[in-house]
Design a protein with these regions (language model features):
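Short, Lys/Arg-rich flexible segments
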Residues: 1-149
Length: 149
């Protein structure tokens, strides 16, 4: 019942919801959470001090996130997460080029995604709600049938 049309419809919203949970771009990281829903641990005072005037690959620290614990330095990691491809039974999302950063952040206790928890519960709940709406809409198109769901 969940077809390619459904997955194409929700993929952009799933990416947006993931970014909102993990990075909180609108709030500058103030409400950002790890994939398991826990707050990010504080950075060490030395790290915070060193990032003040830091440039990575010629890019300065993202000013909006300067005072947050969200894993955003230049914004590259935030922008890297996205849709990868459609498959017959869904779609894949992930970090296209910044996977090593994600792994290193996990080693430091800042988990953005894991094998056990690939997406936050809030994103999974969003997908389930959208799937339910889509299935009901598709079933309503079929008149006079009996369904045991």
């Amino acid at each position: 019942m969940l077809d390619n049309k459904f997955f194409r419809k929700i993929s952009a919203d799933v990416v947006m919801n993931y970014r909102k949970h993990i990075f909180d771009p609108a709030g500058g990281g103030s409400k950002a959470k790890q994939v398991d829903g826990k707050s990010y641990p504080s950075y060490s005072p030395n790290y915070k001090k060193s990032t003040g005037n830091l440039k990575v690959n010629g890019k300065p620290q993202h000013k909006k996130f300067k005072s947050s614990n969200a894993p955003v330095l230049t914004g590259d990691l935030l922008r890297d997460y996205g849709f990868q491809k459609y498959m017959t039974n869904g779609f894949s999302l992930g970090f296209k080029t910044e996977g090593a950063k994600v792994k290193r952040l996990a080693e430091l206790g800042r988990v953005l995604s894991s094998e056990r928890i690939p997406i936050p519960k809030s994103v999974a709940k969003f997908i389930l709600l959208e799937a339910n709406k889509y299935v009901m809409k598709e079933l309503n198109k079929i008149k006079g049938g009996t369904f045991n769901v």
